[in-house]
């Protein structure tokens, strides 16, 4: 391989690592700039397409663009659970709940131990009024958060899911009428 090609590949890898770093640090503008460099070098990079699209969707901005990026990632790798989750989450953020269900269910089926995917599916079920299913998915998410490796553990994400379960239980308890009480 030529030195020019090697340099080009090294630069693309550098931009990709930088994009992930900036996104993780909450520096979204810098992350976007790096993702654009990565996709300029390889417009079919499924990981970059998905990560960039998910970053936009999760922030609730440019949702049509986010959905397009994620669909392009899925076109490259149609069975990737993370990409399916991202698509479902982008639809969720657009209030396209009926469209969100299938990709989120597929993602949870393929990656049944991913706490984020399980939480997203729980969020969808809550929006659809499927309280029992929402609680079940959120509980699975909590259980999986307790199993993740220390380097991947995100206590704030675990706390968010636990709060959703508590809020759902409080709401359901308030909806019960005195005639519903068991002796």
Residues of each region from the PLM?
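Position-specific recognition of the canonical hydrophobic site in helix A of tetratricopeptide repeat
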Residues: 23, 57-58, 92, 126
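Terminal, low-structured helical/coil segments at or just beyond the last alpha-helical repeat
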Residues: 61, 133-183
């Amino acid at each position: 391989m030529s030195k020019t090609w090697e340099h080009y590949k090294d630069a693309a890898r550098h931009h990709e690592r930088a994009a992930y770093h900036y996104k993780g640090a909450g520096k979204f503008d810098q992350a976007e700039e790096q993702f654009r460099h990565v996709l300029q070098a390889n417009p079919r990079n499924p990981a970059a397409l998905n990560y960039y699209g998910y970053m936009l969707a999760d922030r609730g901005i440019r949702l049509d663009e986010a959905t397009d990026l994620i669909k392009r990632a899925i076109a490259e790798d149609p069975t990737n659970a993370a990409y399916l989750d991202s698509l479902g989450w982008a639809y969720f953020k657009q209030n396209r709940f009926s469209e969100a269900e299938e990709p989120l269910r597929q993602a949870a089926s393929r990656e049944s131990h991913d706490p984020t995917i399980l939480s997203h599916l729980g969020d969808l079920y809550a929006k659809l009024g499927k309280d029992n299913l929402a609680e079940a998915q959120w509980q699975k998410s909590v259980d999986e958060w307790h199993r993740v490796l220390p380097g991947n553990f995100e206590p704030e994400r675990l706390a968010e899911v636990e709060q959703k379960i508590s809020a759902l239980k409080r709401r359901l308890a308030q909806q019960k009428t005195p005639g519903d009480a068991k002796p």
